């Protein structure tokens, strides 16, 4: 289903009719998520990233799909970046079960709750991959 290793996980987090977005330094407005730490399970990494970036917890997140990251043709890629040449990033959807007080302690400067259908307008770098994942997240939410 996806190439190993998985280096990052991200999630469309639903709170009622809204989606949680975060403003991440260097990335802009996006869904929360980030890199998996060495030895960390994918779901534990996702839970940690959501707690750090958005100060939320989720009920059972559902895997929507994977994005394969192939740096073979990237002239800027090198071992010093600390990433493998071929890896995957996973995209999830989930329902927020707890909202904690927001603290801009990690990479995020703010957390916002936007109507789900307005998510593409708010997002910093929306593309065909995010659109497909978003449609999958909406379908998952609709049951």
Which residue stretches match the model-derived regions?
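A short coil-to-beta-strand element that immediately follows conserved catalytic motifs
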Residues: 57-67
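A structural signal for short, well-ordered beta-strand segments
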Residues: 11, 63, 92-94
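Short, solvent-exposed loop/turn segments at secondary-structure junctions
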Residues: 3, 29-30, 70-73
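Active-site-adjacent beta-strand/loop module that shapes the phosphate/pyrophosphate-binding cleft
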Residues: 67-100
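Acidic, metal-coordinating catalytic segment for phosphate/diphosphate chemistry
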Residues: 1-10
């Amino acid at each position: 289903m996806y190439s190993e290793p998985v280096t990052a996980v991200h999630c469309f987090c639903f709170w009622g009719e809204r989606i949680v977005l975060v403003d991440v330094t260097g990335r802009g407005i996006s869904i929360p998520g980030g890199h998996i730490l060495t030895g960390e399970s994918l779901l534990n990494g996702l839970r940690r990233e959501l707690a750090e970036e958005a100060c939320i917890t989720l009920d059972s997140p559902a895997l929507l799909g994977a994005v394969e990251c192939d740096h073979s043709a990237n002239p800027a890629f090198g071992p010093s970046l600390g990433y493998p040449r071929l890896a995957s990033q996973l995209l999830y959807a989930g329902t927020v079960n707890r909202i904690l007080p927001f603290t801009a302690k990690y990479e995020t400067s703010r957390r916002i709750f936007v109507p789900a259908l307005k998510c593409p307008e708010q997002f910093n770098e929306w593309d065909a991959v995010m659109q497909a994942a978003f449609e999958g997240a909406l379908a998952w939410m609709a049951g």
